[in-house]
Structures are given as C-alpha cells and as structure tokens.
Amino acid sequence: MLGPCMLLLLLLLGLRLQLSLGIIPVEEENPDFWNREAAEALGAAKKLQPAQTAAKNLIIFLGDGMGVSTVTAARILKGQKKDKLGPEIPLAMDRFPYVALSKTYNVDKHVPDSGATATAYLCGVKGNFQTIGLSAAARFNQCNTTRGNEVISVMNRAKKAGKSVGVVTTTRVQHASPAGTYAHTVNRNWYSDADVPASARQEGCQDIATQLISNMDIDVILGGGRKYMFRMGTPDPEYPDDYSQGGTRLDGKNLVQEWLAKRQGARYVWNRTELMQASLDPSVTHLMGLFEPGDMKYEIHRDSTLDPSLMEMTEAALRLLSRNPRGFFLFVEGGRIDHGHHESRAYRALTETIMFDDAIERAGQLTSEEDTLSLVTADHSHVFSFGGYPLRGSSIFGLAPGKARDRKAYTVLLYGNGPGYVLKDGARPDVTESESGSPEYRQQSAVPLDEETHAGEDVAVFARGPQAHLVHGVQEQTFIAHVMAFAACLEPYTACDLAPPAGTTDAAHPGRSVVPALLPLLAGTLLLLETATAP
C-alpha cells in the first residue's frame, strides 16, 4: 500500500504531466500539421528570387552580444508575452530570408571585444582587441601606432557617395560599436579627453567624442553620452544636482555647440518630446539627440516621458535620412543586450533584445525591401546557456523540471561565468520560481567573476533586400562590410554594374556605368555621319 508521501508525489507528478500535455495544441500531435507547415515553408523558399539591383539604402542592426542562444530565448519570451507557448512565434529578424554565420574573432583574441568587431563588420578589416577603426598593425593603448593604420567605414563611404548617414544606439554614442562608424582609436575607452592619458594627447590622439563631430559629417546621432560633450562642471539638464553626471571634458570645449555651429539646420535635443518635434520639422537637416549622461536606461527602467525607445529613435532617424533622394546609411544598435548579460541578468538582456526586434520590425514598415538592404547581426556572443529540459510553455525565466546533484533547483538560463556565482554557507543557494522571475535576478554562474564575459562562437547574420542573397554560409565578420559596400556600389565597388533599384534614376544612383548603354547610340551616330560624308 502506498504511503501518503508517495501518493502526494504521484499526484504532483500527474498534475505536472497533465499541465505539460494540456498546453500542447492538439493539432501538433498530427503529422499532417508539421508536413503542411514544412510544405508551406518549402513553397516560399522555391519562390524566393534574389534582388539583383543595387541598394539605395543600407541599414545594419547590431544586437550587441546577441548570440544565437539570446535570439532563441528572446523569441520564446516575446511569444509568451503574446500569450503563446513561445518558440513557434517568429521574431521580426526571423523573417529575413537569407542567413549566414559570422566568425567573430579578433586578430589577437579568440574571444573578441566590441571595438575590434565593429572594425570588422563596419570597415571590412579585422583589428586588435579594444581598438576601433584601425588595422591590426595598430596596438592597444599605443597612440603612436594610430597614424597610417586607419581604415574607413562603410558609413564614411556612403557619405562620400552623397548619402545621408545616421547612428542610433541605446549605449553612449561614443561607445565601441557606434564609434566603429566614425572613429580611429587605439583605446575604445577614450570617450572624452579626460579619459586619454596626457602623453597620448601630446602625441595627437583625439578622444572619441571629438572624433564624433570632426571626422565626418553625420546627419543623425541618437543615443546617450551627454557628459563627454561638455566641459567639466557643466550641470546635466536632467540631473543638475548630481555632479557625477555633469560634463567631463578637460579642454573646456562644448562639442555640441561646435557641432551646431558648423551645420545649418542642425538641432540638438536631450529628451523625447524635443526629439519628436525635431524629427517632424522639415527645416531640421541634422539632428543630435543625447538622452542620458552615459548609456541610456534599460527598457524596463526607461522613463517614457523623457527617454525615447530604440524604436522611436529609429523611426525619427528614418524620417530625416529618407529625405535624401540619393539614399542613406543607418546604424542601429541594441547595445544594452550586452550589458544585461555582463551583469548576468538575463531578464534585462532579453527584454532589450525584444525592444531591438521591435525596432527592426518598425524599420521594415517604414522602408521597402526593393531598395533597402537590411542586415541584422551581433558583434559577439556571451557565455549564456539555455537548457535543463524545461516544459514547453513554461517561463523562460523559470526552473528546470529536475534537481541538480546537490538536490537544489536550478534555472533554465545560466551563465558560464560572472557575478551570479554565489555561495551561501559554503554551498550553492537554492532558488525559487519567484526569485528567478524577478527583473533584478542574477542567473547563477559556474565561475566567479565581477563581470560575465563574451563568448567566441559564431553569430548569425540575417539579410533582406537588394543583394541580400550574398549573405550565405560561414563567413569572416569582415564580409558584412563588403556586402554592404558592393550592394550600394560604394568604394571599392563603385564599378559594381548593378541596375538601380526601382524608382531610382542613374543620376541618383551613379554606381552603374552609363557608357555601355550609350555605345549603340554612339555607333549609330558615327555610321550616319560616315554615310553623309561619303562621296
């Protein structure tokens, strides 16, 4: 006869089994469901035709630290927020028809940082760890290795071709990833001149904020990073009583004012209301919006009355940039995905990924894939894992069904290293469902570190639009920059010989040579002249 404890255990197991079976749609038990779904996907794939024209516009969406495990977990979370089981609901990026893998290593490191990876996917050249916009001949923190080793970004090439260009990020605009569009520095942490050693300043090395306004003419700059633009002691408009949030510059410069003075029609804003007004004003030709002293707030902490979302910043940028008949280049970064992972707080990383995906979806609604090449990728991954055989439909932040060898619960999401390593009385603490579901919860880590690290595996590249079919297979991260340059007939691919996108004239898109088209007319004219002058 079974005892009361065994009966209770069987009851709980039966309830768990009933719940797990009850949430699975009945139609999924029928093979026809899966055969029909696969046949529909196959039919769509057979109809897929490469867009062989040139791209008028280029958009690269960069999910900082958004490895494949992050994409999968975010897909489930986004689906569950819509009251679905999770994995069956595609993300906006999932709908891009072409996918490849990108090798993210730096020249000197198996596991990369965001500075050297930015050099790879934006400039088409690999560099050394923690350097930006420089070839591998430059050495980290050695100012005298800068000059002569600069490499040029696709954004810079787009500007030279007459396109408008913009940078949108949830980090500070001087951070490693956005800086890859415009800066050349041997140290990614030289945000303002206060961060640059005196010896490097004497050698002529400029801080990243100075390069932001002087290296090239950027039409739209949106993100955080106010304090690096103003002289030390300048109060911040949002936090006037907090000295630590004020200006940091030692040279006494007001870089925002310098930027405004050089550009007719330029506008500077620091809050959401001003951004919305400026983006709708046809007299505004250049827009700089800096919404926090440093990085922007996580989406879960964002004050929607003061701080715009990534989607709103992307929409504002597209409004301004799309006015140029020659097209545009736009860099959009979900930068705080990375920061959430570094903190071992998966809730923050995944909600940032969802916001990033929302921006991708909105941009797709505001542009056409006939003339806009859109790429989505990550600079690197994280030591972020997703396992433990959780039941489908269970919370992505929940507990695995079984216990660990120490007879304690463990979460579905874990980190290989980081600040989540905790011992309580010499042992791993137990964790409850309510704890693991908190936005502030740190997932447990195997190795104790103050900050969780990047990972070295390949990351995904999603592509849609003209020349997107070139994104295939397993490629070096540098390939991304070259695909963008070729698709838009930018240097070094100005002789791309691609037809202009629909609705675009050759004058607005000079990449295709007009000489071949004129040859028959020229030959006919010469023949008529020869006939007329014949005796």
Curated annotation (Swiss-Prot):
Q: What tissues contain this protein?
A: Detected in placenta (at protein level).
- Keywords from the named record: Calcium, Cell membrane, Disulfide bond, Glycoprotein, GPI-anchor, Hydrolase, Lipoprotein, Magnesium, Membrane, Metal-binding, Signal, Transmembrane, Transmembrane helix, Zinc
Q: Which reaction does it catalyse?
A: a phosphate monoester + H2O = an alcohol + phosphate
Q: What is its main location?
A: membrane
TM helices/strands, residue ranges: 513-529
* Cofactor names: Mg(2+); Zn(2+); Ca(2+)
What is the name of this protein? Alkaline phosphatase, placental type
Q: Which organism is it from?
A: Homo sapiens
Higher taxonomy: Eukaryota, Metazoa, Chordata, Craniata, Vertebrata
